[in-house]
Curated annotation (Swiss-Prot):
Organism expressing this protein natively: Streptococcus pyogenes serotype M2 (strain MGAS10270)
Root EC class: ligase
Residues that hold ATP according to the record: G109, A110, H111, G112, K113, T114, S115
Primary localization: cytoplasm
Lineage summary: Bacteria, Bacillati, Bacillota, Bacilli, Lactobacillales
Pathway per the UniProt entry: Cell wall biogenesis; peptidoglycan biosynthesis
Record's function text: Cell wall formation.
Name of protein: UDP-N-acetylmuramate--L-alanine ligase
CC annotations in GO: cytoplasm
Catalytic activity annotation: UDP-N-acetyl-alpha-D-muramate + L-alanine + ATP = UDP-N-acetyl-alpha-D-muramoyl-L-alanine + ADP + phosphate + H(+)
Amino acid sequence: MSKTYHFIGIKGSGMSALALMLHQMGHKVQGSDVEKYYFTQRGLEQAGITILPFSEDNITPDMELIVGNAFRENNKEVAYALRHQIPFKRYHDFLGDFMKSFISFAVAGAHGKTSTTGLLSHVLKNITDTSYLIGDGTGRGSANAQYFVFESDEYERHFMPYHPEYSIITNIDFDHPDYFTGIADVRNAFNDYAKQVKKALFVYGEDDELKKIEAPAPIYYYGFEKGNDFIAYDITRTTNGSDFKVKHQGEVIGQFHVPAYGKHNILNATAVIANLFVAGIDMALVADHLKTFSGVKRRFTEKIINDTIIIDDFAHHPTEIVATIDAARQKYPSKEIVAIFQPHTFTRTIALLEDFACALNEADSVYLAQIYGSAREVDKGEVKVEDLAAKIIKPSQVVTVENVSPLLDHDNAVYVFMGAGDIQLYEHSFEELLANLTKNNQ
């Protein structure tokens, strides 16, 4: 039976993916959000989903309300619903109920969730009817789907309403310092989540924190080293991607190619292979569809402007920066790697300042954008982007969105734009600069 859903905060990456999925399942979907453009709204607009400014008039009693986690009682629509006792569900609570109708595959972890969810979704949807929610704002819904693949987010323990059949956990790392007190707090959250997985867990076996996880369901370890249950070996990394074999209990279960770069993407693929092997999916089909994976939004997304290679990536944690630069070096071994990074949130920048500097030193040159503050925090003046620049050993400087011309001082470079804020504004400024140079040279 068709329902009408109204999303408060529809441009959020999880919210937009869920909206698209419910729309494709035949439900009427609309939503509201701030007017600022966000990369997720293109998919919503293409689907014909109405995006409204916040207003009490958007809400009618026949609607099911789904509220983004960033929106509280000071939002006029949330306040209206509370005042009139109109029930609503938070995104993660709705998802926890929704997945009960499917055999669900979750992907959790500090880093690599979106890429791994995208890879798992791509393979499974090409084998059988599958619904999915990816953290890049992409969602697909099918009323007949048996399987549901989704991204499981640890922030504020949002994954606690989830009880999936299977879950991958890619790694544990200290992030979200505005919520978690330290690595032990993060690990405890993942341990509580792991206890809710019903059939099997697939965890990276070379992560010391992950090895402390305990759960009633069987735990399968994957990685590169002996002793793991699923081992990736005979690895060849080229400018076309990565080739490798996987063995389980001493037996080779397949030879695989992923058109993706960096060691982290071999691990992501091995996690997907392990999960689908245990779930009884044909490994020959898995190998076929791994070959055709084209990636997810804002994860090593490439474009060429005026013969200049530009990479856009959501990396906003030191571990992710190192992985993204590693991927760029694999694909472009003869080029200078120029990193343009925007720190995301003051709390994360303060907590991980030394680690950010160390990670950015993996690039050949570094440019920094002003820190992007979260809506949840206030700039108390405790950290400036210049503090980060001072700790970077490689050539580095701060640029503004109005003047990105210093980036032109490189002849044979790949430009890697990284961040979770509005780093794309800097990228667009650089693209315009390159386009104008072309016009002036004609």
